[in-house]
Amino acid sequence: MRLAIGGMVAGMAATGFAGRARAADSKTGVTPDQALDKLRQGNLRFMSEPQACVADLAQARQRVAEGQAPWASVLTCADSRVAPELVFGGLGPGDIFVCRNAGNIADTVVLGTLEYGVIALGSPLIMVIGHARCGAVAAACDVVIKKQKFPGSIGPMLKPILPAALAVAQKSGDVIDLAIRENARRQAEHVMSSSSIIAKAVKAGKVKIVAAYYSLDDGKVEILS
């Protein structure tokens, strides 16, 4: 890990962020809207023909061995049932730049990762995906509604999700599902409001940020914003 991080930092220092960004822009050749459409079409393929969503890993591995130009960045939950490469139609290595943690939280590590995707890799789309029956969001709702406490690092981990749970706690319907959707929206907004690098790229029309919701039942990815 130390060598990998050191190499990444050295590479960025040697070429400069601006230079890397210009090179990455030409590498992807994909606009934000085109990237979103590619994800939508891939998800439709996953829903209709899941058996066909298998990547040719050997060929893809050779294609990206010397570099990457992912055309979308995805922040999703660490839940084992949510596999973005499959959900979007059997994508292979090098297609999407993926961040995963419990509750799809845009914390400092994720923000830095997404910024790297924008600056160094030229990724034109950032999608934040919440999913049905998310355990992290359900736990945050338990903290808000039932005053439940969780051991170890789980309690602090849930703090960024609490505002979403609080926002929907008094609403009718499935509070957990409402909170999952609200959290995805808020985390997407947090990416924009907390990163001047990404905000600048969005304002320039080079990057789009969207929130989405993944159904475990039918495999559909619903765009929320």
Name these PLM-found stretches.
Residues 15-48, 52-56:
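C-terminal segment of N-terminal export signals and the immediately downstream linker at the start
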Residues 32, 83-174, 180, 186, ...:
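Short HxH-centered metal-ligating active-site micro-motif
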Residues 39, 74, 99, 128, ...:
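Divalent metal-coordination and catalytic microenvironments
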Residues 68-71, 93-96, 121-125, 204-205, ...:
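Short coil/turn connectors at secondary-structure junctions
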